Amino acid sequence: MSGRKAQGKTLGVNMVRQGVRSLSNKIKQKTKQIGNRPGPSRGVQGFIFFFLFNVLTGRKITAHLKKLWRMLDPRQGLAVLKKVKRVVASLMRGLSSRKRRSYEVLTVQFLILGMLLMTGGVTLVRKSRWLLLNVTSEDLGKTFSVGTGNCTTNILEAKNWCPDSMEYNCPNLSPREEPDDIDCWCYGVENVRVAYGKCDSAGRSRRSRRAIDLPTHENHGLKTRQEKWMTGRMGERQLQKIERWLVRNPFFAVTALAIAYLVGSNMTQRVVIALLVLAVGPAYSAHCIGITDRDFIEGVHGGTWVSATLEQDKCVTVMAPDKPSLDISLETVAIDGPAEARKVCYSAVLTHVKINDKCPSTGEAHLAEENEGDHACKRTYSDRGWGNGCGLFGKGSIVACAKFTCAKSMSLFEVDQTKIQYVIRAQLHVGAKQENWNADIKTLKFDALSGSQEAEFTGYGKATLECQVQTAVDFSNSYIAEMEKESWIVDRQWAQDLTLPWQSGSGGVWREMHHLVEFEPPHAATIKVLALGNQEGSLKTALTGAMRVTKDTNGSNLYKLHGGHVSCRVKLSALTLKGTSYKMCTDKMSFVKNPTDTGHGTAVMQVKVPKGAPCRIPVMVADDLTASVNKGILVTVNPIASTNEDEVLIEVNPPFGDSYIIVGTGDSRLTYQWHKEGSSIGKLFTQTMKGAERLAVMGDAAWDFSSAGGFFTSVGKGIHMVFGSAFQGLFGGLSWITKVIMGAVLIWVGINMRNMTMSMSMILVGVIMMFLSLGVGADQGCAINFGKRELKCGDGVFIFRDSDDWLNKYSYYPEDPVKLASIVKASFEEGKCGLNSVDSLEHEMWRSRADEINAILEENEVDISVVVQDPKNIYQRGTHPFSRIRDGLQYGWKTWGKNLVFSPGRKNGSFIIDGKSRKECPFSNRVWNSLQIEEFGTGVFTTRVYMDAVFEYTMDCDGSILGAAVNGKKSAHGSPTFWMGSHEVNGTWMIHTLETLDYKECEWPLTHTIGTSVEESDMFMPRSIGGPVSSHNHIPGYKVQTNGPWMQVPLEVKREACPGTSVVVDGGCDGRGKSTRSTTDSGKIIPEWCCRSCTMPPVSFHGSDGCWYPMEIRPRKTHDNHLVRSWVTAGEVHAVPFGLVSMMIAMEVFLKKRQGPKQILVG
């Protein structure tokens, strides 16, 4: 038994070691097998595929993987990647050839392709803490594995990649959350953004079709007759020129038609050639004959100066006894080398659009591009909640920025008055043939430095011209606008008001870029941003009415105007007639061209002298063939024939009606019957109207009616334009009261005359005389008289010393009382309890019209009364604008008549106007700055001022009654209740006079400010209470008076000590504090004052409560308990009544029904 046990004994075996030994043997066998295979091992291939998978799916590349990649044999790695490349190329060829493959093969290849890269599709790039998903149009509706989750894009706007791209967040949604108002979303992965290009296959991006509504330039041009852009008159003018040339040159016209017929091979070519030749024909006209508008100066003595204003496309013919006639015209007005002032962009390109968003209650969204000057940004709010990545419903912050690049711009050049050249053309009427005219044409150039110049004509002497370039067209408020190859003269204010991006001429960032960028309404996490299309069409349409300018094509920076005028003086004393000693031509002459109407009331003819030259050609215009007295005027004075067979051009001015033009003497004379339409009286009226039109265009530079000179030297408006200077010349020596009495007598006589024609004539003359005696000459432009404290602007005048007239001589009305009552009702219903006036003028309107507004409210059964309280000339700021009207009110005649007699009663609700801030109606619940002056009307005794409501809240004061002017070293900023006069001393502007009649808290607008480069702390009067932000609002040694006694109105600032006090400069004096009155609370004078570094004499405020010192000047020995301190914390007008116009209406009543003297006096 023991033997069996020994024989069957079991031995212990270590199975772990046995398994390791077995596995080791297998690995050695497999390694040997792999090593014997050619090419990269499967391990290398697997590692490369795994590495590519991590790269393409956006997984993090660990440090261990990077180390293995660096250890990889380059030859084996390249071999694997080449295989991958061959597989991808094969798949692409298969797709392009549309061949059918087996399901198994396609499955394997697509799996490999998905691991490598969906070629041409999505790519994932890590950008800081963000994963950036780049997609194209091929990825519409696809879902991609990103990190530990997946993202889906459904972006219809995604196309081909280009600089016009979008980038924004892909919200991360909860697992069961459905997307809402988003086109990119993720599940299980944070911080993913999507980017895509928006260009089509041709590289074009979508633009907004919206056109900008630009203000038209019409009625903003220069005050001159001109060729205007898009007025539709140029074709008409050229046709008129062609018509006149055809009538006057029939032989050449027939020749042109014959050439066209022979040269052209078909009818179309013949018509085109004929039109081209005929269009060029008028260019060969000369003298003033072929010019549309022409004026004559007749009967002027040659030794005196003749005043004339020259315009382009017009001509003046000067005739004097024993002098040759002279044609002068303005050839061109050119501007040399203007400086570029600004650029206006009308076509922009947007690129690199980025958007960021935030959920509600998580703060504001921000982009780094917001701080870059070349980006247009918009910040707004979008609806967020479940379905777009937010846990709370509400408004979330969203901001979008796009890089702005201007593709096309219009340059604006500033015109330097000293660089303007006027080219004047002068030509003598000597009867020479057209081919010899060049010798008789002289060209003179005038600029700002030119004096008088002489035009010398061989054999005839010299004509002297002196042109006042400084008083010609005013370019100070104009720019030259150049857009591609076209140029215009435009109004400076119009150009600055264009709603287009702009930059200064020296470059820099574009301002107001938002005008060419359209931000569509936001979605949850994105905003569509589009560039507006090319606005060239809108801009050219807006330029309607602007004067055309032509740029010189030879490379110079010279611009030629198609309009303009210049005032000149002409002297003919050095001109002499040629051939006065020649004998008369007696041989038979002939008409080469029969007498033809020039269109200016004259007749022109061409006469041929066969022999007997040199001789004088006798020409006369008579009533009949037997008359011997010349009834016409020779424009071509003393026509002479220099050689035999000479052809002489002669121009005459026949009388009105039938006449005969007689050339030569005796039986061989030439006769031609002539008829001139019109009459001498009609000519007088025509010339007067012509002069009136010219005066309206020229202003004070206009010479006279019909170029006669010296009768009308200045203009106003209306009657003053035509009759003003004549009235002054006839009655200038009479006193004012005498002229008024004469006018009244003429009206009285006219009323009592039985003959209707004489009655109307006398009344008209009397009314004109009284009007010219009592009215204002309506000055144009802006001017300021510092001695009289008078500021003139536009056609209005206001005088500060008479500023109380704004409350006494002016009546204030709402533009529409019913509308204002409706606005009061709407505002009250929205919880606004009242209104604070901006200044005394608005308060006066409410005070005088409260009853009328209450009557309207009462008629419509509105339980509200407008209650006007006394503000003591202190007008503080409210916080709301007017509410818009929801329903209109009615206002009948019955209520109107009742309101004239009875005042409406008080209602339960009160709309408080001004007064103090009380608990029932605090300033925080009042309307403010919601009325502006609309226009100025006329009345018999007072001027009416109409105010209209505005619905936008603004801090700026109404600019309708503000003015600013500078003249040399003096300047002024003024309004009806404020005047600040400044002067310059050693290069520093300082206030010398400051007066204010009321306290107001609107801000002086920059549009009515001179010298805006100033730190607000260096100003004297604070900005928040109407102090102009100007370097002229400054007093050396005194800072901004935020605690000045500004409420002590009326207030005047003077450079003098308060009565009974003295001020010394002491470095140990107290610092700035609240302004202090010079007397104690008991009225005792505080004699001693000091300041640390103020300038002398000291500044003092003289107000309604005594004299005050500014914040820098402090009392020396008075206890604080007795001081009185300031409690302020400042954070086109017709000046003369025009009511006499209504008298003319009343005259019609008198004329229709005869009134006796007694009835007139009583009635």
From Swiss-Prot:
The keyword Metal-binding does not apply. Residues 383-396 are annotated as: Fusion peptide. It holds the Pfam family Flavi_E_stem. Residues 126-244, 286-730, 752-757, 779-1163 are extracellular. GO terms for biological process: clathrin-dependent endocytosis of virus by host cell; fusion of virus membrane with host endosome membrane; symbiont-mediated suppression of host innate immune response; virion attachment to host cell. Residues 1-104, 266-270 are cytoplasmic. Residues 102-121 form a propeptide. GO terms for molecular function: ATP binding; helicase activity; hydrolase activity; protein dimerization activity; structural molecule activity. This is Genome polyprotein. The lineage of its organism: Viruses, Riboviria, Orthornavirae, Kitrinoviricota, Flasuviricetes.
